[in-house]
Amino acid sequence: MSEKIYMAYNKIQDYLNSYFAKHKIEASMFDAIHYLYNQRDFSYKSTELNWPEEKCSNLDDLYQVLKNIAIEVTPIIRNSTANRLIKNVSEHSFFNKRQDANILLQFQHDKNQLHKHDYFEINLVLKGMLIATLNEEKRMLKKGDFLIISPNTIHQINVGSDSIVVCITIRKSTFDKAFFSLIQNDDPISNFFKYN
């Protein structure tokens, strides 16, 4: 298998919603991806983000654009089984070589496990809420809140039903370059980014 495999965000979310409605428990994103892969519900072609001619003037417009994003799932298909969840994600398997950042939606009804990765993750709650577990401490975020997760922080994100949470992932090297002048200061915010 040398070609990259892509799946639409909305297909994965539909599987998670259906599974939850039928069984009253959450399936993992990995379960959904493996199910869709076995059903041959994937593509070997990436779909570009299709921004409408006019600006996204409201939350529904933005959500419609983001839910049609195709997610590359090749590393998940190649490196895991439905029963073995990835606990330590590398930016080399998450970003393609020419990509410095990703924007996607967090899944609802996803049995998200504690994990860590070597890149930054920014979650912005646009609607509803999420519960974030960071180093064994739970925090609830509501509409308008955002959370920056530094590399190698053990965390878990659980998104509420009917919630919309945008997730922006950024390579550590890209983040460091973009905020180099900020991290040169000696204050609590600068130290957070320098030492995490």
Task: State the predicted function of each range.
Residues 1, 91-92, 130, 157:
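Helical anchoring/docking segments at protein termini
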Residues 8, 12, 44, 85-88, ...:
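Short linear sequence motifs
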Residues 18, 92-93, 107:
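Generic detector of bulky aromatic hydrophobic side chains
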Residues 26-80:
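A structured, charge-rich N-terminal accessory region that forms the first stable segment of a protein
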Residues 98-189:
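N-terminal regulatory/effector-sensing and dimerization cores
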